[in-house]
């Protein structure tokens, strides 16, 4: 983390530099003009993690600054949501004098929402006992006078939920409220307002679609729920069990009735589609009945494996969201032989860092 780089007065300049890098880096694929979606310059991150430093009676949050090569005390944190910044102060003031809650505490994680819920995870280098649970419950009650908060305690092979281990986010996408269960310690989009722009862009990019949608790496259904309106049916895959559970929950609370989630990896699904192997998890699902002309992928930073790339090339339209321009560029070396880029976007999910979230719509040549 480079804390000095987080200067809102430099936001436009750093975004312009990202635009230049992405445009120049993908020029060989002759994409259309880059669509740029900016972030708020401050208080844009809905998640934050802090280490905890103990110094006598004092106790405080810190981060490690790679540029300074030193730990930096954090009373407030500019990228974090206003809700995280508000509870940071109240929480640390509660922890300092409380031996049971502070003893061997080494990290605090926050997961907040635009809808006002916040989840606090306290991580310890010791096993948590009954006294900890009593003190944590009292802490939650005191904080609840100001915040809609839940607390989780974690230690090695131990997790204690005082109430629940998730928040429910509500966002407005093209005027429609969408609800998402977000589970502690599972992936969620960190920049909620930019995530809304991503969803709206994806909806617009697929609005003229026909037939069904195949989605790989669907996570908690973030895009699945939003895109379902543009297709007859959606078939989505995800490997992580907590994310599949959250996706099923999100399908239900959003009253979406045309989505089928399958718990399996993209690689295994590629084998199933190629009829190389049969899978018990696909019993009762007729893959041949789906008429998927469009495929949506939002892979991890490592990008897409070769076999899955071959699968993807079989579709007329490919919507690809990437958190790593290098692996996207590598994958496009293959995909560009059969498809051309017709939409190209930069989403500034991670201001003041080198990370760039991008999106491309590819259509068969």
UniProtKB/Swiss-Prot annotation:
Record's GO cellular component terms: cytosol
UniProt KW Flavoprotein keyword = no
Q: Which residues bind S-adenosyl-L-methionine?
A: 189, 217, 222, 238, 298
- Protein's UniProt keywords contain S-adenosyl-L-methionine: yes
Ordered alphabetically, the record's keywords are: Methyltransferase, S-adenosyl-L-methionine, Transferase, tRNA processing
Active site (UniProt): 323 (nucleophile), 357 (proton acceptor)
Source organism superkingdom: Bacteria
The entry lists its GO molecular-function terms as: rRNA binding; tRNA (uracil(54)-C5)-methyltransferase activity, S-adenosyl methionine-dependent; tRNA binding
Cite a single GO BP annotation. tRNA methylation
In terms of SUPFAM superfamilies, this protein maps to: S-adenosyl-L-methionine-dependent methyltransferases (SSF53335)
Question: EC number(s) on record?
Answer: 2.1.1.-, 2.1.1.35
Tell me what reaction this enzyme catalyses: uridine(54) in tRNA + S-adenosyl-L-methionine = 5-methyluridine(54) in tRNA + S-adenosyl-L-homocysteine + H(+); uridine(341) in tmRNA + S-adenosyl-L-methionine = 5-methyluridine(341) in tmRNA + S-adenosyl-L-homocysteine + H(+)
EC class, as a word, reads transferase
What HAMAP family does UniProt report for this protein, alphabetically?
RNA_methyltr_TrmA
In which family does this protein belong, per the annotation?
Belongs to the class I-like SAM-binding methyltransferase superfamily. RNA M5U methyltransferase family. TrmA subfamily.
* Described function: Dual-specificity methyltransferase that catalyzes the formation of 5-methyluridine at position 54 (m5U54) in all tRNAs, and that of position 341 (m5U341) in tmRNA (transfer-mRNA).
- What this protein is called in its record is tRNA/tmRNA (uracil-C(5))-methyltransferase
């Amino acid at each position: 983390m480079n804390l000095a780089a987080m200067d809102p007065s430099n936001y436009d300049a750093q975004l312009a530099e990202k635009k230049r890098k992405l445009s120049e880096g993908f020029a060989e694929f002759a994409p259309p003009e880059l669509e740029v979606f900016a972030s708020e310059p401050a208080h844009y991150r809905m998640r934050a993690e802090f280490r905890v430093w103990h110094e006598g009676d004092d106790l405080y949050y810190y981060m490690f600054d790679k540029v300074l090569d030193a730990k930096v005390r954090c009373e407030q944190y500019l990228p974090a949501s206003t809700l995280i910044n508000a509870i940071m102060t109240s929480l640390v003031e509660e922890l300092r004098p409380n031996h049971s809650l502070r003893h061997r505490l080494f990290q605090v994680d926050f997961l907040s929402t635009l809808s006002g819920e916040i989840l606090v995870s306290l991580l310890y280098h010791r096993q948590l006992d009954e006294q900890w649970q009593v003190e944590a419950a009292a802490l939650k009650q005191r904080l609840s006078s100001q915040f809609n908060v839940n607390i989780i305690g974690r230690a090695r092979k131990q997790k204690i939920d005082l109430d629940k281990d998730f928040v429910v986010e509500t966002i407005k996408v093209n005027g429609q409220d969408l609800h998402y269960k977000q589970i502690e310690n599972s992936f969620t989009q960190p920049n909620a307002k930019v995530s809304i722009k991503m969803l709206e862009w994806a909806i617009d990019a697929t609005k003229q679609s026909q037939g069904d949608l195949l989605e790989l790496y669907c996570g908690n259904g973030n895009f699945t729920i939003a895109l379902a309106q543009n297709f007859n049916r959606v078939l989505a895959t995800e490997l992580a069990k907590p994310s599949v559970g959250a996706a099923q929950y999100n399908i239900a609370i959003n009253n979406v009735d045309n989505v089928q989630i399958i718990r399996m990896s993209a690689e295994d699904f590629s084998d199933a589609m190629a009829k190389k192997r049969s899978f018990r998890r696909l019993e009762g699902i007729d893959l041949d009945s789906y008429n998927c002309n469009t495929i949506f992928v939002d892979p991890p930073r490592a990008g897409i494996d070769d076999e899955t790339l071959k699968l993807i090339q079989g579709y007329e339209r490919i919507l690809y969201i990437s958190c790593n321009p290098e692996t996207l560029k590598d994958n496009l070396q293959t995909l560009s032989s059969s498809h051309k880029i017709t939409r190209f976007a930069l989403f500034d999910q991670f201001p003041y860092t080198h990370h760039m979230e991008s999106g491309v719509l590819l259509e068969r040549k």
